[in-house]
Amino acid sequence: MRKVIGMGETILDILFKNRQPVAAVPGGSSFNAIISTGRVGVPCHFIGSTGADEVGQMIVDFMHANGVSTQYFEQTEEKSAVSLAFLDEAGDAHYSFYKPSVKCPGEKSHPAFAQDDVLLFGSY
């Protein structure tokens, strides 16, 4: 059966409206796509990493809650990446990023790719 494999960065977006925090949600470009894929029941994996801290655990829990396998996802000694998203009056976000030097996943293996599998990738 076809599977979708996402690869990219993960980050916790803390949303501000009128300079007050209103929500905190995991994100990242390919991460968001793979979460949507998991929500509709398509078998999917995410290759990436986050810190072994509270933020990182929130991200891992979010993947599990949305049907995304974390078999190829790493939690490292680095701190997890965080972004502050300041929403303007139109609802558009302006970001400030706080992240360690981002490393591509290394030690964990990746799933075998079949001919009909799909790979989603984004920035690191």
Predicted regions, residues:
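Glycine-rich beta-strand-to-loop/alpha-helix junction loops that act as flexible
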Residues: 7-8, 122-124
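Conserved N-terminal subdomain of the carbohydrate kinase-like
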Residues: 43, 47-123
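Glycine-rich phosphate/adenosyl-contacting loop at the front of the ribokinase-like
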Residues: 1-68
